[in-house]
Amino acid sequence: MADGTHPLGVDVVNQATGSTPRPYRRCVLTLLRRPLREADATSTFYVLTAVAALAFALCFTLNLVFQYRVVGLDPFQMVLVGTVLEATCFLFEVPTGLVADLHSRRVSVIIGFFLIGVGFAVEGIVATFAAAVIGNVIWGIGYTFTSGALQAWITDEVGEENVSRVFTRETQVDLTFSIVGTLAAGALGLVGLRAPVIAAGATMMLLAVGLWAVMPERHFHPTPRGDRETFGHLKDQLVAGLRIARGRQVVRVFLLVSLLVGLASEVFDRLWRVRVLDTFAMPALFGGDEAIAFTVFALIGTLVSLAASLASGRWLPRRVIDTNPGLPVALSALVQVVGVVGVALLGNLWLALACVWLRSAAMAFSAPIESTWLNRNLDGSTRATVLSMNSQANAIGQVAGGPPLGALATRTSIPVALVVAAVVQAPTVLAFLRVRRTAGATSSVSASVPVE
């Protein structure tokens, strides 16, 4: 062009003067920012939710079976892959968030889904330990591009007053297509255990291309400097969270519990399938096929957890949640510990699976109660800080606890590592019971003192 500017708004070299052009680093962002044909934001959100849920279920239903049977990872390597993923998400949350804060939520989401797809594809196609690590780093970085950006994008597009309805519908869409994806994973698993992982990667990359073509962004405004996530902000959150925890016992307990659960959970989540594969033959009902068996196991687990979540919200008396939440939460924590021990020690396949499902059900049952309990003890000015710190405590626990317990599983046995994990998590039961006793004593002394 005559003025030395590219039609997309990027400076080109001025041949007459030989001056240095502006770098082309904005070119990709500019291309991604403009859809070919804008679609309705709400419809786009539901479609991407459906496709992403389908792809995640495709990948994860048989992913750990694939890592063990096809890639040949030992218990330590399997846990290490998960730890690398957690560490990647933790470290890249802030730098990748700058794209959504400064440039475009749409661009951040598109980049994120594409990288997730690339990570899945690398792991599935190459099928080595190094590829599993690299693939999880890539898709972990991709996840941080979507984390927060997707919710912020749809909130910007439909408005805060309408977004609650959209999120409710999103949950239903996500559950439905997760079940569809689980069934599809089982079908593809009959072809080969790597097939659903590769298919998930291709689906995610196609989703990113589709979003580039139609995803609208009409209401984006850069986040003010003071509201952006930075490492300095994380440090401030840590200091503020610790200050709040010193003054409120219930906050201290939740931070401790999140850390302990993180320390114990990674080894169970990554190795219970290996324990089942090493110890038991697959039922003749499924033709002895591992892909079919673990697909059915996953579906049963999903339905059991859904039922437990509904039971928590609809059947548990409200007065229990309001006046004595520590009791059901402590019982749920106890059930989780018992479930881990059961998987480690029981010699019957269906009893071991029942322990897996019981643990998942206990987590689903207690999650809304814990959320209500913690939020009730926070004011608006500190809620986001404490909730973020609570999540970070769990992530730190997973990164710190996963490798040692994985190494223990490799050097001794998986049952030994699971029992140790249960011992690590056991104090959470006492912690919740202690809060309950303290709260009861406090309320009996003076009604004017807030009951935790």
Which role does the model predict for each range below?
Residues 69, 179-200, 274-285, 313-314, ...:
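Transmembrane alpha-helix termini and helix-breaking/packing motifs in multi-pass membrane transporters
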Residues 29-90, 250-298:
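Helix-loop boundary and gating motifs at the non-cytosolic
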Residues 195-213, 416-434:
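Symmetry-related core transmembrane helices of the 12-TM Major Facilitator Superfamily/SLC fold
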Residues 21-39, 216-255, 451-452:
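Juxtamembrane intracellular "pre-TM" segments in multi-pass secondary transporters
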Residues 200, 208-227, 434-444:
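Helix-loop junctions on the cytosolic side of multi-pass membrane transporters
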Residues 135-175:
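Cytoplasmic helix-loop-helix junction between adjacent transmembrane helices
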Residues 114-127, 334-347:
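C-terminal ends and interior cores of transmembrane alpha-helices
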